Amino acid sequence: MKIKLLIALFICVNSYSQSALEIIEKSDAKLRGESSYSEITITIVRPKWQKTMTMKSWSVGTDYSVSLVTSPAKEKGSVFLKRKNEVWNYLPSLERTIKLPPSMMTQSFMGTDLTNDDLVKQSSMVVDYSHKILEEETVEGLKCWKLELLPNEEATVVWGKLIVWIDQSDYMQLKVEFYDEDEELVNLMNGYNFKMFGNKKLPSKIEFIPLEDEGNKTVIEYNSWEFDQKIPSNYFTTQYVSRLK
């Protein structure tokens, strides 16, 4: 009888583990498709001021993306190019493209509450963590899976743990809690204002909140979002970034 119970328990745990990975994979794939093009507004909020910028972004799979700043005038024309684990920055004022060194990867991206490393680790949830379903909860009126993600031993990641809420109907990431190595909650991400982009239902606004900095947050709003568009391969070369429009 004990052997049967152990076998049943093993099958149950293994089944949940597999389902958790599938949920994360489906959610991640939905965010990018084979390729995507988006126009976004980023608002940086601080206790005494706020700043808004707009960008265009193109991506292919998980390895290639390029973002063009379209406003304000001071930053207009700046480009961030991601190729696998490398990030390049084109500065129109200098007419130069520089590769960001490892020492700059943990620095703020354009003054936001995201880092340059966040750009590189876009698919990290799938490949760098083990996955486990904790329970079911309701977020924004939607029934969700609540998942725990723990880093693999060989993974070079910043976070000691992630708690992720993914809705059961459309696989949208509605909420993510980011914990440090001491399992202290550091950052929070919320997705809301759901819209249809083509045949995909997704949060059109994503909010990043650093809990240690009271009153600070970054809000990313997707004004348009198109998937599986044909994007020329030269968009993701250092030679072309100065010509993006």
Where are these regions (language model features)?
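Sec-dependent N-terminal signal peptides
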Residues: 3-14
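Flexible, processing/modification-adjacent segments and terminal tails
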Residues: 18-35, 41, 50-51, 79, ...
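Extended lipid/amphipathic-ligand handling interfaces
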Residues: 27, 55-59, 190-196
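Short hydrophobic/aromatic-rich beta-strand segments that constitute the beta-sheet cores
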Residues: 38, 65-69, 87-91, 97-99, ...
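N-terminal, post-signal-peptide region of Sec/Tat-exported proteins
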Residues: 40-74
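Broad, structure-driven detector of short, well-ordered beta-strand segments within folded domains
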Residues: 57, 78-82, 164
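Residue-level signal for tight coil/turn positions that link beta-strands
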Residues: 61-62, 84-85, 198
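Gly/Pro-enriched, hydrophobic low-complexity segments
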Residues: 120, 143-237
